Amino acid sequence: MAKHIVELTDALSNKIAAGEVVERPASVVKELVENAIDAGSTVIDILVEEAGLNKITIIDNGSGIEEEDVATAFLRHATSKIKNEADLFRVHTLGFRGEALPSIASVSHLSMETSTGETKGTTITLEGGKIIEQKSGHARKGTQIEVSQLFFNTPARLKYLKSLPTELGNITDILNRLALAHPDISFRFSHNGKPLLQTNGNGDLRQVIAAIYGVSIARKSIPVKAESLDFKISGYAVLPEVNRSNRNYISTIINGRFIKNFALVKAIQEGYHTLLPIGRFPIIVLQIEMDPIIVDVNVHPAKLEVRLSKEKELGQLISQMIKEAFHKLQLIPDGEISKKQKEVQKSEQIQMSFEENKPQKETPTLFSKSSIPEYVPSDLDAPREDDFILETMPSYEPEQEVEHAEQPKERIPKMYPIGQMHATYIFAQNENGLYIIDQHAAQERIKYEFYREKIGEVSRELQELLVPIVLEFPADEYVRLEEQKAKLEEVGVFLENFGQNSFIIRAHPTWFPKDQEEEMLREIIDEALSAPSISIHKLREDTAIMMSCKKSIKANHYLTTQDMEALLDTLREASDPFTCPHGRPVIIQYSTYELEKMFKRVM
């Protein structure tokens, strides 16, 4: 017998909606804080007990809610943020569906005090979505919402929650993203009375980065910006030498909303291409402004994913912006000193002279070594060394430096080799200090740039082979190569059919290494066959990386002084001499000051 179709009760509908909107305590925090942001708050307090399972309190100084609208706010799809269908495609607020408050109230005990500041405030109490009490009262302007006994009437949901530290980590991550997206708002977050985050809301994104990731990372960040007809991008990118093992430190923010978008993350990684080791990811915060009409935020229950109508153009703009920002900098990482260094007075240093030295143009520094005032949070925070936020932090604008100073042709200074360690590392010096160079990585970078340029030229200058090379393949590989012959020609492989499942090669580009032609051809073909589909751009890139790695000097290879000098001089001519194509560092510097500090010559 067929079952009758019935309309669900509001209580059941709210619980179903809560299953999408309220997955865990972090979801509650996200929705309520976003409401506070939409209300125009400048200060938001977030007080959490037992990772949100016991109590979540959000206090803001926003616009508040009129008394006659308080009960309506807990009805499904009741909102003040959109009025008609057209508004749905021009969303300027973080929330707009009117689902958060009724969904949260349906699975918890909730109380709210709110006031517009012009009339008496209103207090409302709900349990499981039902209004228990509503009364007038005296309240300051703004809203305070307290959520307790979360999931008390849906015990199955509790089974799927993680440990308290994990749930607290989820809350912290949400608040970190919101703080990065809104540096003009002061966020004060505490757990069980212990302050975990405080930002001062002065609009300085770098200070928020310092509060979240630490001052040392903020010091390693550089401003980035780009603009087109459709997009305006600003933010901070941390130098490649500081990286992480996952993508969690990549923050993309569109119109004040933190979003997850694979294409944009891929574009960011492309901007850092060859600057990061394989399997490592950057720390970067990008704030992107665009017309709401070209971004659809109504495609995900938690609004974390969006649909962009000009995604490819935005990705290209991001990649180019990052590449240009780092291309202006000297990216030689400093040698790390084991202990944290405090500010010391610099005594007179030993003067070192080099007869061959030429005057070096001064390289812009990211931060001056002047003392930086510390900001000690109040109210929710207590003084703690790791929680100090920079009140003022010198900024570095690469564009300004370029306008006022002639760019040196070489991106690294002249270095004079003084020896080799383990036949693997070159030691060199100049008036700036000591340099350690990975000889394989250095030549790999040089050869990579050479091969990348040659492969991209698609030169028709060919060297005829005295003895043509015949290559045989299994039938499946032969068919794939037959389909991709035109693309292979663009990287210098000219295949002619020669019998069953065979090709003959009669010529090759003139830049192929002598006496290694067949090996080179096979490696390029193997590279093409290893990919599920052949992209000419990727094939050129992968081929250049493969050839540069295999044709470079290896570790345990002794070099003469002349060889080392030639290698270092050639490295100076590279466009990006700081990392190998795989992202490993080529060169590390120990400044004269750092060395003298190690030997206690400066106090």
Swiss-Prot record:
Record-linked InterPro entries: DNA_mismatch_repair_CS (IPR014762), DNA_mismatch_repair_MutL (IPR020667), DNA_mismatch_S5_2-like (IPR013507), HATPase_C_sf (IPR036890), MutL/Mlh/PMS (IPR002099), MutL/Mlh/Pms-like (IPR038973), MutL_C (IPR014790), MutL_C_dimsub (IPR042120)
Keyword tRNA processing included in the entry's annotation: no
Protein family per UniProt: Belongs to the DNA mismatch repair MutL/HexB family.
BP GO terms, sorted: mismatch repair
Protein's UniProt name: DNA mismatch repair protein MutL
Short name of one Pfam family: MutL_C
PROSITE patterns noted in UniProt: DNA_MISMATCH_REPAIR_1 (PS00058)
Gene Ontology molecular functions: ATP binding; ATP hydrolysis activity; ATP-dependent DNA damage sensor activity; mismatched DNA binding
Function: This protein is involved in the repair of mismatches in DNA. It is required for dam-dependent methyl-directed DNA mismatch repair. May act as a 'molecular matchmaker', a protein that promotes the formation of a stable complex between two or more DNA-binding proteins in an ATP-dependent manner without itself being part of a final effector complex.
UniProt keyword list: DNA damage, DNA repair
Highest taxon listed in the record's lineage: Bacteria
PANTHER family in the cross-refs: DNA MISMATCH REPAIR PROTEIN MLH, PMS, MUTL, DNA MISMATCH REPAIR PROTEIN MLH1
GO (cellular component) term, any one: mismatch repair complex
